Amino acid sequence: MQSVPTIHVWDLEPIIQSEGHASFPIANREITFELKNSHERMYAAKCLLKVRHPQSDVDSLLFKRFVKQGDRVLDAGANIGYTALTFLLRGAVKVVALEPVPYIFERLNALASNDLITVEKALSAEEGQTEIVLSQSHNQGSSIKPELMEIFPEVYGAELKKALINTTTVDRLVDEHGQFDVWKLDIEGAEIDALRGASNTLLSSPPRLIFAELYADALVTFYQLVSATHPYMYRALIDVKSYQLHLCDPTLQELEPFYQTSPMYVFSQEEIKD
């Protein structure tokens, strides 16, 4: 029997409508995607068809493997709410989702309910206000960290657009919402600041797992700050041949067997057998 060819979401990109909206049910509510944004077109294609999108599937496979029934999750950098809903779909009973950019938060907040608490703030080392530089290429990537603009100048444009946003800390969120079993930190370079605002929580009630997207030298500093509670660190990658999730040595240099996706790392209190 002839095998059915694997379809990746980029195979469909030329024929996916690039304007208008598409809505799909996830975790007992409806999320709407704006098709002008490439990553939202990819989400829509995933919801409609059984297609592969390694960039977002790293998250999906991590959540499927590690989120337990009854987990309470901190989703920092929640964007429009796709990852927050995926956490709920995988068994989380409560997700506290942070998104500081006002026009994106409006969309996230439309999904709010008893099990999805939305917060219009950015994680940082302290409570207050700061400037965020807005992404001009799509609605992902806005950052409060100048070093990220050096890594991805095409995202922010020649003339930077800024907005004043509110900040909070992990310690404050735990005081307000209780402890979390899982943290997801995808906050465009502010992950170290987030840990510095989590010092009390890491001592008293650390999460079982931390998922964090980390660039450049941030990985070393991040690990130094969590190693006392989360001594096991892994790079999450998807194998090209099997499309299975692998948790690899973070120093791995030979990445050819894997899809090239954003550097997502897993920090665990206990050793994980791949």
Positions of the model-derived regions?
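Short, charged, solvent-exposed linker or helix-capping segments at domain edges/interfaces
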Residues: 44-45, 130, 141-147, 274
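Short internal loop-to-helix segment that lines adenine-nucleotide cofactor pockets
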Residues: 48-72, 129-131, 146-205, 217-221
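Core alpha/beta nucleotide-donor-binding catalytic domains of modification enzymes
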Residues: 105-141
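Generic preference for hydrophobic
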Residues: 118, 132, 144, 233, ...
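Short, glycine/acidic-enriched loop or turn micro-motifs at the edges of active sites
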Residues: 78-82, 102, 125, 187-189, ...
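Conserved acidic-Pro-Pro-aromatic motif
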Residues: 94-97, 172-274
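Short aromatic-enriched loop/helix-cap "lid" or pocket-rim segments at secondary-structure transitions
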Residues: 129-134, 143-145, 223, 246-248
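S-adenosyl-L-methionine
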Residues: 1-112, 154-161, 175, 239-274
